[in-house]
Swiss-Prot record:
Keywords: Apoptosis, DNA-binding, Immunity, Innate immunity, Nucleus, Phosphoprotein, Transcription, Transcription regulation. It comes from Rattus norvegicus. One of its GO terms (cellular component) is nucleus. GO terms for biological process: apoptotic process; innate immune response; positive regulation of apoptotic process; regulation of transcription by RNA polymerase II; response to bacterium. Residues 131-142 have a biased composition (Polar residues). This is Sp110 nuclear body protein. Residues 197-213 have a biased composition (Basic and acidic residues). One of its GO terms (molecular function) is DNA-binding transcription factor activity, RNA polymerase II-specific. The modification Phosphoserine is found at residues 175, 177, 254, 305. The lineage of its organism: Eukaryota, Metazoa, Chordata, Craniata, Vertebrata. The keyword Glycosyltransferase does not apply. It is found in: Nucleus. Residues 385-466 form the SAND domain.
Length: 478
């Protein structure tokens, strides 16, 4: 396990903050993510129940997970990453694999900037662990080997021991015609990268999609490099000797003269056999892809080019393929033009239909109905009672053709008082106002005088008018 520095822990926290949203969307179901955090005491029982209740209340799962990650950000612990990218979580949530690789890239970048890297203390002996600091973080490079040991293979650590031991040395057989090319990504500039044996066990069990793969930078995680002699000889015979993807590997059990450690032969187990078969298939597929991209072998090896007859045949075959490609391309162009024509015709017809529909139709003139004489409809005039305020101290009164203004306060003193003012401004009594209107012989002056088509008698009954005198105005005048 690696001893973490504060700078590396800060870099991991910063990257955790950046990838927090991606992790939230990678978790597509509550189990077993919530349970793993609760069982390892990263979240409380209360937060666990609240998160499940929020999911039952149709709150988006990504939002609930993001809230949990935000709380974990406040109390960040690098051991939380081991629970997050455990074997169970990587199997249940496949999208976490890319995020786990991004954390390894952060460790690789930190190793490139800061030398020396964190110290390698030991490897976990439990093969059931899905992720550890040894696989999550970059591993340091070993010291440079002398030129006589540049062809030595990777050193594999035995899980049962307490120090790094050599279990297998793969030596390169020197070839008189060409030097052996080093395997890219594993041996560079005379340096080797130590790898623990638990990496091989984990790579044999997990799927290749879940395995981290970094082809460019210095890697600490290697899939499997143990191959049989027969497969290596077949690969070397089928591929040019100078290619960067091949390496002649021969097992040598004799100890190196300048190597201080004693080599030990690793036992051949069925898991290693399966790994060899799988690795040989992977290498053969990659070899075929590289052979398609590379030029012919006769150009690389310096062999003379084929004769003119073969070249003519190759030209004829190439012309045939070009003609076939041109014919298929022409067919595609013709079908595309036909589609465009039909589409244009459909659009033009639809535009014409829309124009015809949008044209204004001629309005028909309404036919005049024959006028029927003798039918006169009398519309009743609207009553103006609502417009008159009977509670005002003055009322507009009429008596025949005479018009004037009645003052309620003066009428309370008696009908003999001059309480009506005519249009000329003269003050009149009730009797004088009746004479002006031509109704001097009226027996009831309250019915003869009207206010907006209502008699003073009706106004008195309604409470709008008060008269103290009960005597008739004729007697008062007498």
């Amino acid at each position: 396990m690696f001893t973490l520095t504060k700078a590396l822990e800060k870099a991991l926290l910063q990257h955790f903050i950046y990838t927090k949203l991606d992790i939230a969307y990678a978790i597509n179901k509550p189990f077993p993510f919530f349970e793993a955090l609760r069982d390892n005491s990263f979240i409380t029982e209360r937060m666990y129940k609240e998160s499940l209740e929020a999911c039952q209340n149709l709150v988006p799962l990504s939002k609930v997970v993001h809230n949990i990650l935000t709380s974990l950000e406040q109390t960040f612990d690098p051991s939380m990453l081991l629970i997050l990218f455990s074997k169970v979580n990587l199997r249940e949530y496949p999208s976490l694999g890319a995020i786990c690789r991004s954390f390894r890239n952060v460790g690789n970048a930190y190793e490139g900037r800061n030398r020396p890297a964190p110290t390698l203390l030991g490897a976990s002996t439990n093969p059931a662990e899905g992720c550890s600091f040894q696989t999550l973080l970059p591993q340091p490079r070993s010291q440079a080997l002398p030129p006589s040991h540049l062809s030595s293979g990777l050193r594999i650590r035995d899980p049962g021991t307490t120090s790094l031991q050599i279990t297998e040395i793969l030596d390169e057989q020197p070839s008189p015609s060409h030097p052996a090319a080093p395997l890219p990504g594993y041996i560079r500039e005379g340096k080797t990268t130590p790898v623990s044996s638990r990496d091989h066990q984990r790579k044999d069990k997990e799927d290749s999609q879940e395995m981290p793969h970094h082809p460019s930078g210095p890697e600490a995680v290697v899939k499997d490099i143990l191959t049989s002699k027969t497969n290596n000889r077949d690969d070397s015979g089928a591929q040019p000797p100078g290619s960067p993807g091949t390496m002649h590997v021969v097992q040598d059990n004799s100890p190196a003269p300048n190597d201080p450690e004693v080599p030990q032969e690793a036992p051949c187990t069925p898991a290693n056999k399966k790994a060899r078969k799988r690795k040989s298939c992977i290498w053969s597929n990659s070899k075929r892809r590289r052979q398609k991209k590379k030029p012919p072998q006769h150009k690389m090896m310096g062999v003379a080019s084929p004769g003119p007859g073969v070249q003519e045949k190759l030209k004829v075959v190439g012309q045939r393929t070009l003609n076939q490609d041109d014919s298929t391309r022409n067919v595609k162009v013709v079908t595309r033009t036909l589609r465009e024509r039909t589409r244009c015709a459909q659009t033009s017809s639809s535009q014409e239909i829309s124009k015809e529909a949008s044209k204004p139709r001629a309005r028909k003139r309404p036919q005049k109905r024959p006028h029927t004489a003798g039918r006169t409809i009398h519309v009743p005039e609207k009553s103006k009672d609502d417009a008159v305020d009977f509670l005002s101290p003055t009322l507009s009164v009429t008596c025949g053709e005479a018009r004037g203004t009645l003052f309620k306060e003066k009428l309370k003193q008696g009908s003999s008082e001059k309480c009506i003012q005519n249009e000329a401004g003269a003050w009149l009594t009730v009797k004088e106002f009746l004479k002006k209107g031509g109704k001097a012989t009226s027996k009831d002056w309250k019915k003869a005088i009207r206010c907006n088509k209502k008699t003073l008698r009706s106004l008195e009954q309604d409470g709008f008018l008060f008269c103290t005198s009960k005597s008739k105005p004729q007697k008062e005048c007498d």
